[in-house]
Amino acid sequence: MAGNSRFISSAQSGPHDDLAALVHRHLDHPFRKPILDYNRQAFSAALAARDAWNPGAPLVLDAGCGVGWSTLRLAERYPDHFVIGVDQSSDRISRGKPLSLPANAHFQRADLVAFWRLFDEAGVRLARHYVLYPNPWPKIG
């Protein structure tokens, strides 16, 4: 199958020379970026959608779901789980899909870093976590 994606290339030939020091620095200092209210509201809305469907349902997170095809497929694959598709782009999430949204699926616009932190803060454990479309140049913020 041919695609039109650009080839990913980098001048970096191996791990960064200071990788260990950078990791230790981040481990030694807490992440201080505040979680914005809209992310807290998005997190609450996602859990409320799960609770409305089945309060005890295991959770599947489709991180960076884009237009949501993977969220729909995951909901089909795990009919007894509640699948939350999260993406930062409301444009991508809102793009039309020929399939209807299953009852065990929910799309949410939110910042993924905040969403992950909110799962941890709330003590919520995921049954499955998918990152199917990784950005080769992730950015926080």
Regions found by a protein language model. Name each.
Residues 89:
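Conserved SAM/SAH-binding beta-strand->alpha-helix loop
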Residues 81-84:
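Short beta-strand element of Class I
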Residues 63, 86:
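Conserved beta-strand/loop positions that form the S-adenosyl-L-methionine
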Residues 64-68:
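Class I SAM-dependent methyltransferase "Motif I" SAM/SAH-binding loop
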